[in-house]
Regions:
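An alpha-helical repeat/solenoid feature that recognizes helix-turn-helix modules
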Residues: 1-51, 56-100, 108-134, 146-171
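Glycine- and acidic-rich phosphate- and metal-coordinating loops
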Residues: 141-145
Length: 171
């Protein structure tokens, strides 16, 4: 495993391993509430969590659930996790790792048409000011084929993505 275990983000369960997804959710929330929180604590906590996410970035950009390398093998990034990580790092949109990961996300979507991946990606592209109409069309096509298997999370995120709901995630 190649990661810095000293960098802490957030975990699914208290006192356990820091994962990219819950860390990204927490970062968006904390960044949106930072005006109401102690600035010293927010700056330190956000900075460490951002460093943790960047530390876990896969070779070539993007993220998976928590590790970039295991047993000497580079792991693949996932589009949904990549989009969510980029959403949490949107205030660093011009930084090279973010730009590399945006390009990687575009490539990942060529082979992945899941509702969850498309919805998170559209929200991400919209937050970064990138064109998303092609992906909205792809999401609609995917929904017509699968109805996203009736899963609430991708359906809800797709509705947000199709209606410019990215503002909910703006930090």
């Amino acid at each position: 495993v190649k990661l810095n275990p000293l960098l802490k983000g957030w975990s699914w369960t208290a006192g356990t391993f820091s994962w990219v997804e819950p860390t990204a959710y927490a970062l968006v929330a904390v960044k949106q509430l930072k005006a109401r929180l102690s600035q010293d604590q927010v700056i330190a906590r956000v900075g460490e969590a951002e460093r943790m996410i960047y530390d876990r970035m896969c070779v070539g950009g993007g993220w998976n659930y928590g590790n970039s390398t295991v047993l000497g093998e580079n792991l693949w990034p996932y589009p949904d996790t990549t989009a969510l990580a980029l959403i949490s790092l949107q205030d660093h949109r011009a930084d090279p790792p973010n730009q590399l990961s945006l390009k990687a996300l575009q490539k990942m979507l060529a082979d992945n048409h899941s509702g969850l991946a498309l919805a998170w990606s559209i929200l991400c592209f919209d937050l970064y000011g990138n064109e998303s109409s092609h992906w909205i069309d792809q999401m609609e096509k995917s929904y017509l084929e699968t109805e996203f298997l009736g899963e609430t999370k991708p359906i809800a995120l797709a509705l947000l993505a199709a209606s410019h709901g990215e503002q909910i995630f703006r930090v």
